[in-house]
Amino acid sequence: MADIETKSSQNQPLKTQNIFIGAQIFLRIVVIAASFASTWLMLTNKQTIDIGGFVLDANYSYSPEFKFLSYANIVVGAFSFVSLLFLVLVGRRSSNPTYYFILFLHDLALMSLVLGGCAAATVIGSLGKYGNSHTGWMQICDHFGKFCKRATTSVAFSYFSLVCLLILTITSASKSRQIQV
């Protein structure tokens, strides 16, 4: 095992390895920031309006899709922090492709989770913005503009996190291809 690790680190120049590790660290920090920004925007998203004496309120907790997105972002942010620690502790010392395979699986799982949250929130957001005339569901964003804008911004941060996780998944997969069996 030590021979494989030595050969792998000799095949790759140190500068390239440092750039790769730096990019991984940067992208993971961006994922953490975007995930927690999305979570904060969604968890604090509420609006109350008065229409003809009727007080109506909109809150993220009324929608299971928005709650799922928030919880998915919390999990993604927390596990991205764990993977950042793993990368800092292990990545600097060793360029063993097995470690990058572990990161690949980790990033793929997180990407799948945030993709599910984004898809669910996008569907309910579209329904709120445009309604559905076939089922009789009316649009609400013309009345709850602030609520819809914050929800849209939250989902946009989640999609940004998704793109960063996709890049991390691709780079980790590329790096793990060097595993010798």
Swiss-Prot record:
<feature type="topological domain" description="Cytoplasmic">
    <location>
        <begin position="92"/>
        <end position="100"/>
    </location>
</feature>
<feature type="glycosylation site" description="N-linked (GlcNAc...) asparagine">
    <location>
        <position position="59"/>
    </location>
</feature>
<feature type="transmembrane region" description="Helical">
    <location>
        <begin position="19"/>
        <end position="39"/>
    </location>
</feature>
<keyword id="KW-0472">Membrane</keyword>
<protein>
    <recommendedName>
        <fullName>CASP-like protein 1F2</fullName>
    </recommendedName>
</protein>
<keyword id="KW-0325">Glycoprotein</keyword>
<dbReference type="GO" id="GO:0005886">
    <property type="term" value="C:plasma membrane"/>
</dbReference>
<dbReference type="InterPro" id="IPR006702">
    <property type="entry name" value="CASP_dom"/>
</dbReference>
<feature type="transmembrane region" description="Helical">
    <location>
        <begin position="71"/>
        <end position="91"/>
    </location>
</feature>
<feature type="transmembrane region" description="Helical">
    <location>
        <begin position="101"/>
        <end position="121"/>
    </location>
</feature>
<keyword id="KW-1003">Cell membrane</keyword>
<feature type="topological domain" description="Extracellular">
    <location>
        <begin position="122"/>
        <end position="150"/>
    </location>
</feature>
<dbReference type="InterPro" id="IPR006459">
    <property type="entry name" value="CASP/CASPL"/>
</dbReference>
<feature type="topological domain" description="Extracellular">
    <location>
        <begin position="40"/>
        <end position="70"/>
    </location>
</feature>
<dbReference type="Pfam" id="PF04535">
    <property type="entry name" value="CASP_dom"/>
</dbReference>
<dbReference type="InterPro" id="IPR044173">
    <property type="entry name" value="CASPL"/>
</dbReference>
<feature type="topological domain" description="Cytoplasmic">
    <location>
        <begin position="172"/>
        <end position="181"/>
    </location>
</feature>
<feature type="transmembrane region" description="Helical">
    <location>
        <begin position="151"/>
        <end position="171"/>
    </location>
</feature>
<keyword id="KW-0812">Transmembrane</keyword>
<comment type="similarity">
    <text>Belongs to the Casparian strip membrane proteins (CASP) family.</text>
</comment>
<feature type="topological domain" description="Cytoplasmic">
    <location>
        <begin position="1"/>
        <end position="18"/>
    </location>
</feature>
<comment type="subunit">
    <text>Homodimer and heterodimers.</text>
</comment>
<keyword id="KW-1133">Transmembrane helix</keyword>
